[in-house]
From Swiss-Prot:
<feature type="region of interest" description="Disordered">
    <location>
        <begin position="65"/>
        <end position="104"/>
    </location>
</feature>
<dbReference type="GO" id="GO:0022008">
    <property type="term" value="P:neurogenesis"/>
</dbReference>
<keyword id="KW-1003">Cell membrane</keyword>
<dbReference type="Pfam" id="PF15505">
    <property type="entry name" value="Vexin"/>
</dbReference>
<protein>
    <recommendedName>
        <fullName>Vexin</fullName>
    </recommendedName>
</protein>
<dbReference type="GO" id="GO:0005886">
    <property type="term" value="C:plasma membrane"/>
</dbReference>
<keyword id="KW-0524">Neurogenesis</keyword>
<comment type="function">
    <text>Required for neurogenesis in the neural plate and retina. Strongly cooperates with neural bHLH factors to promote neurogenesis.</text>
</comment>
<keyword id="KW-0539">Nucleus</keyword>
<comment type="similarity">
    <text>Belongs to the vexin family.</text>
</comment>
<keyword id="KW-0472">Membrane</keyword>
<dbReference type="GO" id="GO:0005634">
    <property type="term" value="C:nucleus"/>
</dbReference>
<dbReference type="GO" id="GO:0030182">
    <property type="term" value="P:neuron differentiation"/>
</dbReference>
<dbReference type="InterPro" id="IPR040470">
    <property type="entry name" value="Vexin"/>
</dbReference>
<dbReference type="InterPro" id="IPR027900">
    <property type="entry name" value="Vexin_dom"/>
</dbReference>
Length: 207
């Protein structure tokens, strides 16, 4: 039952339309039948496509994959165990054991050739350097000779000085000009000790 209201400025009109019960019952039946059909369709589809069983099927698939991997590994091992002459396409054209020493020999010859060139240059350069070293050695020898003479003089003047002090005393003045820095440091240490020893000795000397 439907009611339609039409409003105007002067009057209000109401129109009513009555729907018989037979029509409503037929429409309800159609709706119910459609619901039943949908339910049947759902049941049929569920029967056709059963739900998967993941927990039961997964181990079987893993086992199949494991067996496939094992077969592949076995075939790989068989291929590697075969002699190299069986597969000429897979083996390299030249053997590795022969090609490696050739390259090493070539590298060794190059390195040997390079190492031969610098020594010749060094020998030619070292000749004047050796003369300079000999000249320096002679100068040092002269300085040491002067130092030994100075030592003798000091030993005559101060007979009570110890041997370490005597060795450190001549390294003063002009004798330490051509001496390396490390020796100078050592001599200065001995010099300080000798000065202290000389002071103690001079205190006991008679005037």
């Amino acid at each position: 039952m439907h009611q339609i209201y039409s409003c105007s400025d002067e009057n209000i009109e109401v129109f009513t339309t009555v729907i018989p019960s037979k029509v409503s019952s037929s429409s309800r039946r159609r709706v119910k039948s459609s619901h039943h059909l949908l339910a049947k369709n759902v049941v049929i589809e569920s029967d056709l496509y059963p739900p998967p069983r993941p927990l039961e099927l997964l181990p079987q698939r893993c086992e199949r994959r494991d067996t496939g991997d094992r077969r592949w590994l076995q075939t790989g091992r068989l291929q590697t165990a075969r002699p190299p002459g069986a597969h000429p396409t897979k083996t390299p054209s030249r053997p590795v054991g022969i090609s490696e020493p050739k390259t090493s020999n070539l590298c060794g010859n190059r390195a040997y050739g390079k190492s031969l060139i610098p020594p010749v240059a060094r020998i030619s350069v070292k000749a004047p350097a050796g003369a300079e070293v000999a000249a320096k050695g002679s100068e040092h020898g002269a300085v040491l000779g002067r130092g030994s003479r100075h030592l003798k003089k000091i030993a005559e003047e101060y007979p009570a000085l110890p041997q370490g002090a005597e060795a450190s005393l001549p390294l003063t003045g002009s004798t330490s000009c051509g001496v390396p820095g490390i020796l100078r440091k050592m001599w200065t240490r001995h010099k300080k000790k000798s000065e202290y020893v000389g002071a103690t000795n001079s205190a006991f000397e008679a005037d």
